[in-house]
């Protein structure tokens, strides 16, 4: 008797299941990280302009679900920053554009790592932390547009 592979092991079925799982997980992470909430407020309505800086390490929101390693690019321009995920991770995560007037910056240290934290005026509970050399490149690219002063964040409704 010849052994046959089970029906569920067909390459088409395995590939389909993988794609469905990828879409589902990416969709859920877009909500868990806060990207969807930011998209309601800061969805980009233009092409990315400025100096692109690929983030080696960044975190959005307060939990561990918003970790971005080598999949997030920030375009630093004269009017603000634009955030874009790589296409494989862009499901339910449209580009964001945040003007400099909507950003407050703080610096900190967690364990042995320095970071720059961006807080957004309309969504102060969804910070964006940028780590390491990439964070410093964003700061340098912004030059005189970098928000030096802390601004008063909007009071919760």
Put a short name on every predicted segment.
Residues 2-76:
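Anionic N-terminal interaction surfaces
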Residues 40-53, 102-157:
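Acidic, Ser/Thr- and proline-rich intrinsically disordered linker/docking segments
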Residues 50-56, 86-93, 133:
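Short charge-dense sequence patches
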Residues 78-113:
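Phosphoinositide-binding peripheral membrane targeting modules
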